[in-house]
Amino acid sequence: MKLSRRSFMKANAVAAAAAAAGLSVPGVARAVVGQQEAIKWDKAPCRFCGTGCGVLVGTQQGRVVACQGDPDAPVNRGLNCIKGYFLPKIMYGKDRLTQPLLRMKNGKYDKEGEFTPITWDQAFDVMEEKFKTALKEKGPESIGMFGSGQWTIWEGYAASKLFKAGFRSNNIDPNARHCMASAVVGFMRTFGMDEPMGCYDDIEQADAFVLWGANMAEMHPILWSRITNSRLSNQNVTVAVLSTYQHRSFELADNGIIFTPQSDLVILNYIANYIIQNNAINQDFFSKHVNLRKGATDIGYGLRPTHPLEKAAKNPGSDASEPMSFEDYKAFVAEYTLEKTAEMTGVPKDQLEQLAQLYADPNKKVISYWTMGFNQHTRGVWANNLVYNLHLLTGKISQPGCGPFSLTGQPSACGTAREVGTFAHRLPADMVVTNEKHRDICEKKWNIPSGTIPAKIGLHAVAQDRALKDGKLNVYWTMCTNNMQAGPNINEERMPGWRDPRNFIIVSDPYPTVSALAADLILPTAMWVEKEGAYGNAERRTQFWRQQVQAPGEAKSDLWQLVQFSRRFKTEEVWPEELLAKKPELRGKTLYEVLYATPEVSKFPVSELAEDQLNDESRELGFYLQKGLFEEYAWFGRGHGHDLAPFDDYHKARGLRWPVVNGKETQWRYSEGNDPYVKAGEGYKFYGKPDGKAVIFALPFEPAAEAPDEEYDLWLSTGRVLEHWHTGSMTRRVPELHRAFPEAVLFIHPLDAKARDLRRGDKVKVVSRRGEVISIVETRGRNRPPQGLVYMPFFDAAQLVNKLTLDATDPLSKETDFKKCAVKLEKV
């Protein structure tokens, strides 16, 4: 068989990757090389994390049969991580759901019944009855949706329109609340706009990398490979890694720092103090582009109001702040001396000084990276604000090789959850439901009556659990997420509400997850390239893909489910008379007609698709649904610093980083010469703020919501491992990944194990104040906790570690702290 150079590279990429991963090379190589001409290739972003790697997807006879890194993708440059190479297999698990399943007994729905196959019409019949009953009896606040940072952009947009405009309920929130909400609030407080100002191109231009609570070696391995290349090829590049336990990223670290949980706040303030004391402030930048404010303190822990910690808080949930002088700020951080910081954190003084010197050195270009260690934190917003302080004091921001960078964990936590605005308080392009002007903009664009979108913030993720338990939220639809496994405090706050006979729970998913099996109705869902989609990654890169195969059986995309279900409701059934009177022409119309089959959305014909191009939703409806929704959504950000390119441009490109102005993407925001919104002569402009200045916040250390004591004497931290993604609902169906890490283990220091008469491989009961799980003792391996802390991944459905965790949240972002609670161990 004769191959072009390009085809030869494609074919061999899989073989090379398989060899690097230690897989059986001949079979993989033959599958690609031997059948090259028979396989159809097309591009897509990876289905997993927020890095946004580009892959080439090979299809044959209606199935995805191969996958390789896309050599033209600027993010990963042809390389995949181990999960990326097995993308085809996530779609073909033996237990893939192919038809709706309803709990039934004696031929009808029963909360205690067995899951029984039904048709889509029957599923929508039951859903329609439950939604209409709840809306009639209790109103819009009795229904809710929990969505996903894995939704495509138009799925999230369609869901937000259906709930906020159609059902008039802001009780829609994404699972990104559990991972990125603190980053969002941190960005908004400091800069007035969400998402990083830099991009991945910084990696090759930086002199120093500082990881705050980020194990990039396992969670963002492709970016880590680029950092590793930079570090090993340049002796002047430095890597510092901070964590509460030792992990694989420490292998590259020049300065590996293990600190006491929660004390990262102390370290951040110490570095600010060091910068000031050593006259390392960039005075020109600081004087022109920065304001100083002192934030409210003693703000509580996002627990129920009846909890003692909430009762004791002086300013529960307060986001207030007041202006302060530089002298006052200097005095504030002066308290965080080297001696005090070393004592509070357990970090040796020399390591602290080395870290501070990186930021203080005017000749060092520094990037700060962080993920869940910062965000899943009862003071996660503060941690985000405090790291911005370091970059604003030194002016190391919005320039190549310099800047703070919040990494995302889901493929479209940025593009869908944040940019589209699927949070309970947000609207597209950083607008919010509490702002009348913002609501008015959306209502006019959507051609719905003024006053349709509620001004009240809806229920966030943890509040949804509590409302279900309390019987206030009665119909609940979750999509593309597995919150029964991933959310905190399963026993006390989630399971009771899901199984409450007053409530009806719908789960849309490709597989029978823990969440699906706890639901009342399961809807089978199309996944990844079984639909046309778009994701937005951590560097503001929006990427599109085409539908490449059809979903099995009766599985349907989340977009199809939302749009088709909207046909079941007429405006009179969901809107009060005073709204209908404002737009009488909408009487008698379905929500489908009002929200989706509008002149604005339906104006792009199906004929724009290639004749052989799959697009199940658009061909069924008779118009190019995805293009119509995207162009309507993109209107909100254009001209406002969130500019997205025209729809068709994304199918041609390997992603574009917004703002995209006059066909050109933006690598670095807020700086002259890089950002089209910064005029000549302005230098820097943080245009999310009215005065164009960013904010440095004075924020102190405050303790964790729960710490070890005499009985529960260990910290528990939870997280992920390289081989599995989140709850493992996809990766555990890949035999190779499952074999590589078949079950969760409890990583523990050997001396802590010895003190409890535990040995490696022993079964151990892990107990918190909320529940218990049985796990396996691991005293070796990739994760090495210090004495006093244990670490456990949450991918294993047989070991629900979130039975143990506390539902404490950051009071500002409402994001859960999965990194800190107290446990004890009992030998089994």
Swiss-Prot record:
One of its GO terms (biological process) is nitrate assimilation. Residues 39-95 form the 4Fe-4S Mo/W bis-MGD-type domain. Mo-bis(molybdopterin guanine dinucleotide) binds at residues 83, 150, 175, 179, 212-219, 243-247, 262-264, 372, 376, 482, 508-509, 531, 558, 718-727, 802, 819. PROSITE patterns: 4FE4S_MOW_BIS_MGD, MOLYBDOPTERIN_PROK_1, TAT. It holds the Pfam family Molydop_binding. It catalyses: 2 Fe(II)-[cytochrome] + nitrate + 2 H(+) = 2 Fe(III)-[cytochrome] + nitrite + H2O. InterPro entries: Asp_de-COase-like_dom_sf (IPR009010), CT_Nitrate-R-NapA-like (IPR041957), MoPterin_dinucl-bd_dom (IPR006657), Mopterin_OxRdtase (IPR006656), Mopterin_OxRdtase_4Fe-4S_dom (IPR006963), MopterinOxRdtase_cofactor_BS (IPR027467), Periplasm_NO3_reductase_lsu (IPR010051), Prok_molybdopt-oxidoreductase (IPR050123). Binds 1 [4Fe-4S] cluster. Substrate binds at residue 794. It is an enzyme of class 1 (oxidoreductase). Its main location: periplasm. Catalytic subunit of the periplasmic nitrate reductase complex NapAB. Receives electrons from NapB and catalyzes the reduction of nitrate to nitrite. This is Periplasmic nitrate reductase. It comes from Shigella flexneri.
